[in-house]
Each structure stands twice: as structure tokens, then as C-alpha cells.
């Protein structure tokens, strides 16, 4: 789609894998919305989130900062690190009032000459906005605090009479959004299924009104989320799963499935919401794929992590070009060794399989200067033909929303005990 007009770009095309990913994410979002009803209106980690933002702000503090500002930040840190989080709404309200008293409007305490585009101003503004949102939401949902001996759920608030009409309205909004997710997730994929091969076509060309003759024929593919979901919904027969190719490769004693391009995306993207079962072929494949990526990076003397991404070439509009890259020996595609493009989001995906190794690699990427204001840069191109003479690499200074989003999902998979997998599996058809 044209991002300015939202009109479909030509050729108009219905992608099987993108549609499957969308349907799976909509069902996961629907389950996440349903959870909001029975969660405390003040999440247990709300004040920890404020403290995290404050600590990032403190890290940006220059040595020349005023003593008053440093003292204020220290008082805020002390207030946000109690022995126990607030146990009642009244306790939470008192803590919010204390934060307001100590440091309400942190931005106003910054030096007059501060760079408003700098990190210090950004994080001070983020803290102020985060604090106001928390305080305003609590006041909106629970105007009468003292009658609760614990922190109630949204559903409990909605039963407490007319004073809590906004909680009732919030529940209606949640139900409306969940219903829309369900409706949008109901997609008919049957016209994309090739009955003769038992495989899913890669898509449908709307302009030519024909199904694409090419099919997704490998289990180690980003399309397996669509396959899994459609079998669960009885849109495709179970035999489709077993029609997916299971060509094997081995390296260093590890056996794994072969993908088309040997990219981290093909192996790990579906795991962002799909369940993983230890000691299965897919689980062992994903681990082996990460191990091989680590080894290949070591062999080439670069940080590891190769996937589909932008690279250091632009079109006439100075837009970075994009395609799949991978590790030789892991993919069927020819010429995988001709390019060397490292995508930081590939390391983020690997957090789900090998968290320690992935974390170390992300730290290395940051130390090399590949971390920008909005996260890690899209890619680092080490391909000699695309690097200036005398330089070893070229940074692709772009940020792609879907790669940043995948990175966030991989982080929450690791840090929050796989909530997306739990939500995805809460759908009765998928659970069955």
C-alpha cells in the first residue's frame, strides 16, 4: 500500500504468508484483549516501568547537570523503589501524589539550553507522559479509591455502580475491539490451496485474476504459521502439514531442516506466536539454525545474524532495496555466500532459542555503533562490492517497523514467559 494515500500498489497481490501471519496475530490480539478484563486495573509492573524510564533518563544525565536536578532524580528513584508495590488503589494514589510532589513536570527542571532533540529531553518527556497516563487512567476508571482493600480488576470495577461507568465503557471498548479482531481473522484461504500438490500457493495475483503457480513446499518456512492455523480451522486437510518438505542437512553434529534462503526469519518468525515443543524436529531445527548462524559469523569475522533485510543499495528515490539473505548450507537458494549482510533483528529473534548468545551478540552490535535513536539499525552490509574503498562495512541507516516489532515480541517471549504463545493457544480450535 502507498503509505501516504493507503491505496493498493500494483501489482495487487494477496499473499498467503502475510495473510496467515495477520490472521494469527489478530487471534492473539483478541485473546490479549480478553485478558484485560480480569487483570488488575493497575498492573503490578506499572511503577517498575516508571522506574525503568527514570533509570534510562539518569544514564543520559551529563556531568554538568545541576545539583538540584540530580537530587530530584535521586528522590524519585527512592520513591519508586519501595519494599513492596502498592497493594491497594489508595496506596497507589498516595505514591502517585508523592511522585507529583517530588518531580512533577521533569521537563521543566532541565537546563534552558538543553537540546530538545536529544536523549535527555526525550526521556524526561517520556517519564512525564508515562506518569500522567498512569495517574489519569487510575482517576478515570476508579474515582472512589478507599472502598477497595485490594487492586480490583476492570470487571470488578464495572459492578460497583454508576460511579464506575467509565470502567463499563472500557469493557465495551474491549469487547468491540475483540469482536473486530475475530471478524477480521475469519479469512477464506481455500482458493489458495493446490489440491493436486497438497500445498499452499504463495498468493493470488488480483490484477491477472489467477493463483500463483508457485507454492510454499518447505516446513522450514515463514509460511508454516499459516499452515498450522488453517489446519486448526479445518480450512486445509491435515495431510497438508505432511506434504511440506523435510529435506535435512547436518553441520557439526546438528541435524536441521533446510529452508529456501537460510534466513533467520524463515526459521524463527513463526515462533513469535506459535508454541514450541522440546526435542521435536522443528525445535531442534531452530536451535541448529542459530548455532550455524553463530558459526558462520565467526568464520567470516563479523557479528552474526543473517535474514531478509534492506542492504546498501538504493533505487532512484534513494530508498534502500530489500531481499532475503541467508547462511550457505542452510538454504536451497544459490549464491548465498556472495553477500554478507547482518540484520540485528535476526539476533533479537534468536533470543527465543539461545538467549545468552543472542544477548552477547546484540551487545557487540551496540558496541560497534549499530544502535540508533530508535533501536538497532536495519542492517550492516559487509559485502565488498557495496562498501566504500577503505571501509569494511556500510550501515543501512533505516528502521523497519516489522523488524522492530519482531524484536519486541522476541524480547517479551524471553522476559515475560511467552505471553503471545499462551494467547495464541487460548483459541479453542488451535488448542485442540
List PLM regions with ranges.
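Ser/Thr/Asn(+Pro)-rich, low-complexity disordered segments
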Residues: 1-432
Amino acid at each position: 500500500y502507498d503509505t501516504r494515500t493507503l491505496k493498493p500498489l500494483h501489482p495487487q497481490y494477496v499473499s498467503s504468508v502475510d495473510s496467515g501471519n495477520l490472521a494469527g496475530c489478530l487471534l492473539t490480539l483478541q485473546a490479549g484483549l480478553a485478558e484485560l478484563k480480569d487483570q488488575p486495573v493497575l498492573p503490578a509492573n506499572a511503577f517498575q516501568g516508571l522506574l525503568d524510564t527514570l533509570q534510562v533518563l539518569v544514564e543520559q544525565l551529563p556531568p554538568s547537570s545541576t545539583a538540584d536536578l540530580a537530587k530530584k532524580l535521586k528522590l524519585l528513584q527512592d520513591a519508586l523503589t519501595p519494599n513492596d508495590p502498592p497493594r491497594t488503589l489508595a496506596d497507589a494514589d498516595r505514591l502517585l501524589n508523592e511522585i507529583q510532589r517530588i518531580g512533577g513536570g521533569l521537563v521543566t527542571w532541565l537546563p534552558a539550553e538543553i537540546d530538545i532533540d536529544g536523549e535527555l529531553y526525550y526521556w524526561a518527556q517520556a517519564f512525564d507522559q508515562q506518569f500522567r497516563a498512569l495517574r489519569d487512567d487510575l482517576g478515570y476508571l476508579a474515582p472512589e479509591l478507599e472502598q477497595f482493600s485490594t487492586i480490583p480488576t476492570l470487571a470488578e470495577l464495572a459492578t460497583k455502580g454508576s460511579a464506575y461507568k467509565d470502567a463499563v465503557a472500557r469493557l465495551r471498548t474491549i469487547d468491540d475491539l475483540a469482536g473486530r479482531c475475530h471478524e477480521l481473522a475469519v479469512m477464506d484461504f481455500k482458493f489458495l490451496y493446490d489440491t493436486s500438490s497438497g500445498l499452499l500457493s504463495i498468493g493470488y495475483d488480483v490484477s491477472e485474476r489467477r493463483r500463483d503457480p508457485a507454492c510454499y513446499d518447505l516446513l522450514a518456512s515463514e509460511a508454516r504459521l499459516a499452515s498450522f492455523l488453517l489446519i486448526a480451522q479445518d480450512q486445509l486437510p491435515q495431510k497438508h502439514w505432511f506434504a511440506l518438505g523435510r529435506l535435512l542437512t547436518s553441520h557439526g553434529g546438528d541435524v536441521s531442516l533446510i529452508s529456501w534462503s537460510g534466513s533467520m526469519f524463515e526459521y524463527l518468525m513463526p515462533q513469535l506466536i506459535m508454541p514450541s515443543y522440546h526435542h521435536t524436529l522443528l525445535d531442534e531445527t531452530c536451535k541448529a539454525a542459530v548455532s550455524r548462524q553463530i558459526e558462520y559469523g565467526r568464520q567470516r569475522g563479523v557479528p552474526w545474524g543473517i535474514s531478509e533485510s534492506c542492504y546498501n543499495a538504493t533505487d532512484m528515490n534513494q530508498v534502500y532495496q530489500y531481499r532475503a539473505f541467508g547462511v550457505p548450507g542452510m538454504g536451497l537458494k544459490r549464491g548465498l555466500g556472495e553477500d554478507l549482510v547482518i540484520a540485528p533483528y535476526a539476533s533479537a529473534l534468536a533470543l527465543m532459542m539461545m538467549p545468552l548468545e543472542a544477548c552477547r551478540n546484540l551487545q557487540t552490535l551496540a558496541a560497534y555503533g549499530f544502535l540508533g535513536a530508535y533501536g538497532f539499525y536495519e542492517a550492516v552490509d559487509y559485502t565488498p562490492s557495496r562498501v566504500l574503498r577503505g571501509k569494511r562495512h556500510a550501515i543501512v541507516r533505516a528502521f523497519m517497523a516489522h523488524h522492530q516489532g519482531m524484536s519486541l515480541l522476541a524480547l517479551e517471549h524471553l522476559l515475560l514467559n511467552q505471553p503471545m504463545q499462551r494467547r495464541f493457544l487460548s483459541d479453542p480450535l488451535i488448542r485442540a
